[in-house]
Amino acid sequence: MPFVKIDLFEGRSEEQKIELAREVTEVVSRVAKAPKEAIHVFINDMPEGTYYPHGEMKKKN
């Protein structure tokens, strides 16, 4: 049962997240030979100020 976690800065619309989840499901199903019903996509909206690569705050562009 594939689980896919996607972390994004918040700000995408519900429609964009639905499209992303559907497209990711299609690719994982095709490549991993997994039934779509078994694939779970988690999209985490990260608020600005919660991501610190290399110890520095990352701001969305």
Curated annotation (Swiss-Prot):
Keyword Isomerase: yes
Protein EC: 5.3.2.-
Catalytic residues (UniProt): 2
Entries under InterPro entries matching the protein: 4-OT-like_dom, Tautomerase/MIF_sf
Enzyme class: isomerase
Keyword flag Isomerase: yes
Molecular function via GO: isomerase activity
Source taxon at top rank: Bacteria
Keywords: Isomerase
Protein family per UniProt: Belongs to the 4-oxalocrotonate tautomerase family.
Name by which UniProt lists this protein: Probable tautomerase stu1128
Organism for this UniProt entry: Streptococcus thermophilus (strain ATCC BAA-250 / LMG 18311)
